[in-house]
A protein has these predicted regions:
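Substrate-binding clefts and catalytic carboxylate motifs of secreted carbohydrate-active enzymes
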Residues: 49, 56-63, 70, 75-76, ...
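Loop/turn elements at helix/coil->beta-strand transitions in domains of secreted/extracellular proteins
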Residues: 6, 277-279, 308-315, 332-337, ...
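Secreted/periplasmic carbohydrate-active enzymes, especially glycoside hydrolases
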Residues: 1-290, 294-314, 518, 528-534
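Aromatic-lined substrate-binding rim segments of carbohydrate-active enzymes
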Residues: 1, 304-307, 313-355, 400, ...
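The substrate-binding groove and active-site-proximal loops of carbohydrate-active enzymes
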Residues: 51-57, 157-158, 256-257, 285-298, ...
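Active-site region of glycoside hydrolase catalytic domains
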Residues: 79, 83, 97-98, 105, ...
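Alpha-helical scaffolding within the catalytic cores
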Residues: 263-270, 325-326, 350, 357-368, ...
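Short, solvent-exposed turn/loop segments enriched in Gly/Ser/Thr/Pro and often Arg
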Residues: 14-16, 40, 187-194, 284-288, ...
Length: 543
């Protein structure tokens, strides 16, 4: 770095080693595979090779899609701060703060300073001293700093359960000469997560637990072992492919943060709780925030407003495709809990990453970057399946160490969950009530055609009618159910209920009625069984 002249910052962008070859969907050859070789390079935007909901993105979203910042600092630096809010539940009239941060001394001599934490009128000071080139982890609780307490805090709640109050907080290093050496600014939502779920021990049968990670994970060790999972005998409803499982409990029942409870109605299914209150999760999956990674606040905020106005309270970040700070900021502001996947998809179909260590380093960086967001409620290893045993153990250890405030689950649909799907149109909407509704379901949906105005945004007018290969390129579904494809079932149902269409506008108008009927039935079916084993339902897809 030359401080007296202009400096040039060069950024080299490398293509993925395994970009794969997208399948060009058409009527004759069908929808093609979901993803492909790009999964080997994980973590990547695996859907950009093409999926059954998105054509291939030609450059696989290579390049820079967020701001790049160059920071000039002093010899003492604050690194990777984590603030945990600990409520003495069920009491919410006070909160204790747990502040963890690394501090790095890049100088060649010992340095001292005072570490200041400020939030909502609370101010705590702690002296630090670091040797030359030392990086030190500092963890402060109310035991070390009695000031790390607040009375009558304003809480953060999911949409529909209360407000989304966010405190401005800062962590500063102040020298003996009162100079500010470094400062980290954050927005903190005061809330505490708990989970009701089932697990098993060596001898007793499956047990039902109330699990509080903030209490249970302060030793930095996992509470559950997903590799030693047990399959449950639950044949109550349609379940997708791989069955239903519960994890092995690594810590004794009634140890800190793990409490035995009695609840036969919820079976083994997960219930998410915020501030001691059960949250009935309603929302949808985001496959990608934007296909071309145009991810400004101006582009994303209307989607979050829509979710809030639809009374949703959860977004699933499917395979971690939404990667920017503003996504989580908006989820904080609009009260959307986030089920955050990592970059793995369907076990037995999608390829596993070639480099587990690279994958876990990216997990570590992702968790450290976003863990202060109150909206994140759940970390998840894989969409539709389990990670390999080696990678699963690495992930579980990493999450317990890096984020002792949230649950980590090893599977999006089969672990303390009731499966995923189906994704086909149901002519008889009552089927959702009779045969499907219940549990915590990470995906369920139906083909869903947008308005004619939207169709004309991505098709030339001459291609909009009749249905042609241009429709199939844009994923007019060719998945089969029995002798018919998803798109045939959808169109047939529309024709039977509302009559055949002979132009795009009429077809899309009728589609909105069919879409409304289907999605209303899905949500009402889950609502009808709330806490009578139903705890959450996420549409495929809501964005």
């Amino acid at each position: 770095m030359d401080y007296d002249k202009k400096n040039l910052l060069a950024i080299r962008i490398l293509p993925p080693n395994n970009p794969g070859i997208p399948h060009e969907a058409n009527r004759k050859e069908g929808i093609g595979p979901n993803g492909g070789a790009l999964c080997l390079d994980g973590p990547t935007f695996i859907s950009s090779e093409g999926w059954d909901w998105i054509p291939g993105i030609r450059d696989r979203n290579m390049g820079i899609w967020q701001d790049v910042r160059v920071k000039f600092g002093n010899e003492l630096e604050i690194v990777d701060t984590h603030v945990i809010t600990d409520l003495p539940l069920p009491d919410t009239t006070s909160v204790n703060f747990i502040v963890q941060t690394e501090i790095y001394n890049s100088s060649k001599t010992t340095r001292t300073a005072n570490l200041h934490f400020n939030i909502g009128g609370v101010s705590a000071v702690y002296p630090v001293s670091l040797n030359a080139n030392e990086k030190k982890m500092i963890k402060l609780t109310s035991n070390e700093c009695k000031e790390l307490q607040m009375k009558n805090p304003r809480l953060w709640w999911p949409n529909g359960y209360g407000g989304q109050y966010l405190y401005d907080a800062s962590l500063s290093l102040i020298s003996s000469g009162k100079d500010t050496l470094d400062v980290k600014k954050m927005r903190i939502g005061i809330r505490e997560l708990e989970y009701e779920l089932s697990a098993y021990e060596d001898n007793p049968p499956i047990v039902r637990l109330n699990y509080n990670p903030t209490a249970a994970l302060q030793d930095g060790k996992p509470a559950f072992d997903t590799v030693k999972r047990k399959k449950t005998d639950n044949k109550v409803r349609y379940t997708n492919y791989d069955g239903e499982f519960v994890p092995y409990l690594l810590k004794p029942v009634s140890s800190q943060g793990i409490e035995l409870i009695k609840d036969s109605l919820m079976k083994e299914y997960m219930v998410i709780k915020v501030n001691g209150q059960r949250i009935f999760c309603k929302g949808g999956n985001w496959g990608m925030d934007d296909g071309m990674k145009r991810v400004s606040r101006e582009r994303l905020e209307p989607a979050l407003k829509l979710h809030k106005n639809m009374n949703y309270n959860m977004i699933r970040n499917w395979t971690g495709e939404s990667t920017e700070e503003v996504f989580y900021e908006l989820c904080d502001e609009y009260g959307m809990l986030v089920m955050n996947d990592f970059w793995l998809s369907t076990d037995g179909f999608n390829l596993n990453p070639l480099d587990n260590c690279l994958f876990v380093r990216n997990v570590t960086e992702t968790v450290r970057r976003f863990r202060n967001h109150p909206s994140i409620a759940l970390w998840c290893a894989r969409n539709e399946g389990f990670a390999t045993n080696e990678l699963e153990y690495m992930l579980a250890a990493t999450l317990a160490k890096e984020d002792g405030s949230r649950h980590y689950t090893g599977n999006s649909r089969s672990l303390n969950s009731s499966g995923s799907g189906p994704w086909r149109y149901q002519f008889d909407a009552g089927w959702y009530y009779r045969s499907l509704a219940g549990g915590f379901r990470s995906e369920v949906g139906t083909p869903s055609l947008p308005t004619a105005e939207t169709v004309r945004e991505f098709m030339a007018e001459e291609d909009t009618w009749p249905i042609s290969d241009v429709w199939y390129y844009h994923d007019w579904h060719n998945h089969r159910y029995g002798s018919k494809t998803f798109s045939e079932l959808y169109k047939e149902g529309m024709d039977r209920k509302l009559g055949p269409s002979d132009n795009l506008d009429d077809f899309c108008r009728k589609a909105q009625l069919i879409n409304y009927e289907s999605h209303r039935a899905i949500f009402e079916a889950w609502n009808s069984k709330m806490w009578n084993d139903a705890s959450g339902e996420l549409l495929w897809m809501s964005h």
